[in-house]
């Protein structure tokens, strides 16, 4: 799997768990750690790059940041999932992580808390979820084949409208 923890990730998970309380404090710490440990660079990784490989490289794009955070969260016992969608104001798709934690109100319910390790922030307004899964391979935004002449071109557009939710 793309988020399998190697020895380096397991050591980092142990270190992070030792200094932060399980739950949101630990997820916040992991989010910040990934942001500080990686440099955003295009074309140094691909869709099959593992979390371990991206961390070893110390660089990648949003899906790599998300994979590293997922590997760390899971190694720390934090249930988490990969989110693919859009961040309003950015041109392309974006990836972030949701950590699923109990509500602590005794109901047995849980809530997904969004974390964006690419920007060292919590998700919120402006994050539009398209799909969730274990990692990128579960939620690839497109699949298929396009064949054309030498001058062919494939373009895509997106439009997002916000509506009131009651």
Model-derived segments and spans:
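Secondary-structure boundary elements
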Residues: 1-60, 136, 148-166
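Hydrophobic/aromatic-rich core segments of domains that either
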Residues: 32, 64-151
């Amino acid at each position: 799997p793309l988020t399998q923890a190697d020895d380096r990730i397991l050591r980092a998970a142990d270190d992070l768990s030792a200094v932060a309380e399980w739950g949101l404090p630990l997820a916040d710490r992991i989010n910040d750690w990934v942001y500080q440990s990686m440099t955003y660079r295009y074309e140094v990784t691909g869709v099959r790059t593992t979390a371990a490989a991206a961390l070893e490289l110390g660089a990648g794009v949003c899906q790599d940041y998300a994979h590293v955070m997922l590997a760390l969260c899971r190694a720390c016992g934090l249930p988490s999932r990969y989110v693919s969608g859009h961040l309003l104001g950015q041109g392309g798709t974006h990836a972030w992580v949701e950590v699923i934690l109990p509500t602590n109100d005794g109901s047995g319910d849980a809530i997904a808390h969004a974390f964006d390790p690419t920007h060292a922030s919590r998700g919120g307004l402006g994050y539009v979820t398209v799909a969730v899964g274990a990692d990128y391979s579960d939620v690839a935004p497109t699949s298929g084949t396009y064949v054309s002449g030498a001058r062919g071109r494939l373009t895509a557009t997106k439009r997002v409208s916000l509506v009131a939710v009651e």
